[in-house]
Amino acid sequence: MEPFQSNWQTGVTEQRPELFLLSGKEWSDGISAGFTGRRGGISKAPYDSFNLAYHVEDQPEDVLENRRLLCQQLGFDPKGWVCGEQVHSNHIACVTAEDSGKGWADRASAFQDTDGLITNVPGILLTSFYADCVPLYFIDPVRRVVGLAHAGWKGTVADIAGEMIRTMERQYGSQAADLRAAIGPSIGMGQYEVDERVMEHVDVWTGRLEGNGQVPTYAKSGAPGKTWLDLKQLNRELMIFAGIQPQHIEVSQWCTHERHDLFFSYRADGGRTGRMASWAGIETE
């Protein structure tokens, strides 16, 4: 079953944008987590219409209103919004109550050089932004900790998935065996062709990850020197390598490139487009 379920059937409007809600008991028991679509919101083309990121050339006031609409729909106070200035790294920030609002109104106030966020504070809404890259979600249902990570190919081969797990263990006392994880909508292997330069970094992991899963991490394409890369599966294998049980990982089948009617896609939209947001937060009582 697809873990990210659209709220489209409940009616999507400018004021009530489309959300893809992460389902499952662990993700619904006082935890809000999911992924935004591109429908709804107020941004104009080519960012139409639910763009959540400032770093594209969208009007800042439209982005801010879209963020307000998301918080309103989720029931989170905008003052609890937190995001990072993503740089395709494996850098992670542990978010406290004092960090509330970082990145809400501008890029300068966000966590700089950061692609992973973790918190155990109710009312904090962790967010990160995408247009083909892979959103990673983590929850420790025992210690009530949530985390998000942004994984492009650079962050993936830098093992941001493993770094998230190790940081949760080190900073929050989590145990990998307790963790649940999800991999959200992103570009699928059949649409993500990379060159030998990228595969040199991927191949460093290949031998170490053998036997983790039954789905190949990548397969050769017909073009010389090119490979179709499955970033979702590679991140899944990295999670397993770091200690998460395979049955505790859910993987979305949504491909942002194939369904760029529903999602922003950097490759399908020619590079000039908006960004979806992943989110995760512990709800206040």
Regions found by a protein language model. Name each.
Residues 1-285:
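Active-site microenvironment for binding and transforming phosphate-containing groups
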